[in-house]
């Protein structure tokens, strides 16, 4: 299905873990925070003793020592000790200035035991007010605004001051002390303290109370001990609220006060717990948002950002093992329900990399809708670093790209807050400590253990350093292990092998465990790696690992203590880069600003199922941090005591969500790059900076003023520009009651203008200042109270600054009240169009050694499906490159390459993408693909694949427009072209790859032998002359040769010159074996040579050995072998206990001979001879025995002339078994293994029992334990002797042993599988499109297996088969929960059956006739019309070319119909043209129509010949006219050429003299020049003639009146005709009328008749008739035969009336369209009425899970929308949608009936799921999934759905932890082709080995 074209799919943005939730504090400020709290929150009013509070405040006082300063600066990421003395003195630090006067708690104004809160506040304010003079003096010294004031338990305030100025502060009158603020490091909340969350809890008591956060993820375990509320009295969502919602929604349920609502949208049941074994992503996310743990042990408790917020468990990922993706329909439903139920914030830690920003994307549209309802959306940015970081997915650019963005969809949503990830300061994770108990102490160091089961597997073991051949630390190759590894912990180095192989080889060597040492030379722990879970393994950093290696090398016999335990450690990554290296770069590909903000996401400790915890990393972890913070902000807005509460209550919809986002971005703290002189980290990486939750809350409580760009976004998007002066405007909003002025920050670092740079040594991206660049305001920034001000700014760049670079930075504004505002800006200086969309062949990304072939042609063999890299050649140094002149394929079915496609490395996201094939003249042959967008290429770390755009293949055929058939294109040069527009640009780029279509094999002649002797050694060569006239000889110079049937399949040829007629002289060296087979005589030579298109020539010849003139006997294959066995070439067994050995050779005469048998008896050879080729064959009988034989060959039948004698040994005695036993003779077993024993004959070399090689003892006895599976097992035992003879015995053993009764317990028939099943009306045999019913059949493994589908128990028959039905309707994505169990075990597992279907084909209405031919003389033909469908996606193909498609990522459950206006040009060929138009929907239902058009070029016809009936005087003259050619029609005009009409068959009767014009016309619209014929021989004023004229005019008047009354002509020309008629009547009525006057009146009236314009022109008539036909087909008989109550006619009759009116032409097109619209409105109403009438209220009022509305509402919405449409084709699309809805509702009604009858053992269901699936009990995972292997702990977005786009050539799939692309890849596989050309001996060998001739990808290290 082409719904989701996303480069790998939506994944959970993090799979790395939550470090302890905690943060850097604010010195003595921990005490100060408590003080601040007392004056603001009533809960402290009478509960804290003043003395106690004072103690808490003053205990933290510290001397201003260097150590204290260093500690404070370290918390800000500054190494104080690395500063010089001047810098140390100039450094600003935080201090507390304490006053001499006593605080309120000590000055006697308060009684601490019972003073009220109001009194405390009042007296505290007095103390603070008295600080004014001292503050002013302090600010004079510090040049900084004083910070927070407090006056209850401490009389003082905070400020920043340079170290050198601290003594000055102490000298100010009224100052008691100046105390350096201390830094505290809480051990349980590192991430929270990074963003000042705890200060919010402490100062404001905001913890999320009264807020709801929706967690759209993999699920939540609501029973976790940390999923709690401290008090559930004032929750936002009560149980009543939830049950009210679920009563309407008809899904989901209430769980706990903490998790009040949840639903599994993926499986359509109430199981909201994620049953993934390794890690539960959604549970981790939920903990970060709102865990509310208790206790002091940070490893056993977590407190989230908003611990008192309620969480919604919106599970959108299935528990099925068959799929780890989700679809748009599922995701959109969860988003919509989040808004409906009243979530304040929704979090989506998921996405598809490198997304766009279009509302056509259903998820982005749903996010906007949620914003409009007031629900804020917070979404992860993604974990792919940059697109230029190759396989690493980090902050690097190896390619020098201008476009490195990777932010994923739906994080690109304009209204969402998109979150980047910063590293946590500390990390809780498994850590290892290694010691010998005295001298050695390594660690603790963070590790990733392969399984928690192995924590004790390394302790007190000996260690073994694995070394390679050079004595260095081995990378783990199997050959490097020795027997010493057994029982020890092996140590190897990272590199070359993937981790799983390293584990496998260590385990195979008998090691007890494995330690892998990193290879980067740093102290960075080796984590985030992919290990199997079955062998004890972990990694160490390079430095720690080397120390261990050194120790073990010196102490090889020591046993070491190894402790592995959860430990809180400093985060090594934080010291290297505060940002997480994986966080995805922005901006959006159209230069919109993203990401928005940064939060802690690297190494986060959070919750898991069953009261568990783990560490994970990713933007998945950063996003919920922001979601929790926005819950706190929302709580602040809802606080009625907030001074701005009244203003906040006015915020609704997007105004509210945009405000939350703006406040957080305006108060964020930009992060500096510690590796590059503390310059800023790019806003494209960090957004507005690290969230500061306290600063945001402070703003909401004190001054919520904001600054945004002119477009309202809290970041300036400069887009692309080329002028060095760029102006932009900012809007400042003052929400206070006093005027505010702002100054730009004077810090030159903060306020500098930056651009991007790349470290040449490491590829790391960083920002650098642009010297000479500046931003200045155009005026002072003054904002009146309660007003806004728009200020213009100018960005100035130096004239020398090069274009094609980013320009970015931060604008920091200091307010007159001490407030600060932060605003990032970003733009591109240059033309955004200019960056290439596609990497070239052998381009910057091309790296075969790294497994990346970049942009490369792919050639496919149709028989095998194997793919090969086109044009790939290897030079002398082994370097592979693509030679674009060698790219070719063949239309010959016998060739290896049968079609061509392209693997594109897209450097950018592109839109309006088209892929064409052009011929050698640049003419378009076909359009292979047309798509709205394609995603750039990137490396997906989880699937370990590059996500390329794999464009469709061309097989060398084309649509022949002349007859409508598909034909093979001519050989020649062609071009494979891709074109598209870079996202954000407006210029189309084109990238061409040349190739050749070549169906003819090369010609080869003059095959011969030559020889060269060097240093006494003779080298023989097979030479030839070869030529290929199109694609050229194989550029790899590969050739296969055979000499006397001795082959060399890996030979290469060299060019030895060119002949005069263009042949290439080639020579190929013979192998040593071939040279030895040469004889003096007729040597048989074969040369197998291909061209670049893979056409093969197999040329054989008889050649003489160079230098030899004699013709001796030659036996092929080097002669008769020394031994003849069953494996010898030429041996063929028979059924009589022996066989035949056949050999061949050459000799100038007939050959005869003899051989001896097993008894030594001599026999004649059976020989044949071909005199034409001097070749012979001979055969001899052999018996199944071992004996010596002699063969003699003679030149005569008398056997007197001996040519050659051979001695050979016949070895055909096969090995034998003695006492062979399987399972001790029993056919049955209940064990996991059986024993196979026996003895073999002494000549046996090996015994294979299944896949096991049995060990043979001295008596040739063997015994092997063979594993067996449940059911029948065929065990084969094969003995092989030294001669290759084999004997095989086999037996079938039936096993009842089944360690996992649920594994593969259920299988389905007819291709149905767990997970997604996509089909259309004709592609699934189990589905009936007429009823919408699917009948699912299958079989279970055990009689004890139980099966539940959609909450209903399925009956299992005695033969273990089952059958049940599901009501699927005709359109949609329907998930059904499945539970499989076993009555013998108390466990089940959950799966899902998801059906994605569309059983309704699109409608297609064309404006041109499809019944009758169309004729034209215009070569440019326009195909116009409309197509509709019941779903939103349509693609259009014309003549086999895919010319248009709509946005493919649709929500198939939306109920929105599809509509496509068709307006496509076609270039006509001369003569007949058959134009085929096909429209296809999302599930490949196709409707096709054909238009036949005849075209001839415009030409001038020969004039007709006019002949009068007489030239003599007469009363009348008849003029006849003949055209010059057949097929032409002659027309005449009597009004001087104003109008023409056909000449009647009898001619034109003329009654008055005058001039008549005649011209010829044809069907194509061609005309001849008009010729005049002047009639002068009419006798004037003859009474008879006058009477004739009167009669003619009378007749014409009558005809005119008939025409006027017909109603077929438009009003204007009908009115003109009436006037002409009246004028003619007046002339007729004149008593003195003359022949001339009457003739003139006749002529004028005829002109008016000729000028009548039809109400319905022919072209519009054809279009309308086609449309009416489509409507009738859509109605069918059932609906068509229903009666319209307003007319009393059936709808079919009404349509027939319209057809008749159209045929008659009595209505205009608009009138007919209006009438059709009325009919369709009536049809829609009738259909809707019928559906509603057939739907009981309990069903009609139930919720449609797909739309979230009731069925009645769905019906009404579709009806209303359809009737509101003005376009008939759109009404038709709504009719289709309503018909689909009818099927769905009917299914729902039937399901309700079934439910009312009780248990339905057939399992019929219509809901696409249900509520009957039980949730697993606490502690039970709900599934026994077996070992799936561990996943990497590096971030990744969970994929939403498999992408089946044209960017991949096979189905896209993903896992929860990462994306995985599709594509066949270019890996050739080994298989025999199904058809073989009629080649000779060598040709047959070569063709059978074609599959191994392609390129192999090197296995890469993970």
Swiss-Prot record:
GO cellular component, one term: extracellular region
Membrane topology, from the record: Peptidoglycan-anchor
Domain named Peptidase S8: residues: 191-697
Residue numbers of Pentaglycyl murein peptidoglycan amidated threonine PTMs: 1870
Enzyme Commission designation: 3.4.21.96
Signal peptide: 1-33
MF GO annotations: serine-type endopeptidase activity
Keywords: Cell wall, Hydrolase, Peptidoglycan-anchor, Protease, Repeat, Secreted, Serine protease, Signal, Zymogen
Cellular compartments annotated: Secreted, Cell wall
Coiled coil: none
Location of the region described as Disordered in the Swiss-Prot/TrEMBL record: 1793-1872
Residue positions of the active site: 217, 281, 620
Motif (LPXTG sorting signal): 1867-1871
Main location: secreted
Biased composition (Low complexity): 1793-1805
GO biological process: proteolysis
Domain of life: Bacteria
Top-level enzyme category: hydrolase
PROSITE patterns noted in UniProt: GRAM_POS_ANCHORING, SUBTILASE, SUBTILASE_ASP, SUBTILASE_HIS, SUBTILASE_SER
Catalytically driven reaction(s): Endopeptidase activity with very broad specificity, although some subsite preference have been noted, e.g. large hydrophobic residues in the P1 and P4 positions, and Pro in the P2 position. Best known for its action on caseins, although it has been shown to hydrolyze hemoglobin and oxidized insulin B-chain
Propeptide segments, given as residue ranges: 34-187, 1871-1902
Functional summary from the UniProt entry: Protease which breaks down milk proteins during the growth of the bacteria on milk.
Family: Belongs to the peptidase S8 family.
PANTHER family with a match to the protein in the record: CEREVISIN-RELATED, PEPTIDASE S8
Protein known as: PII-type proteinase
Gene: prtP
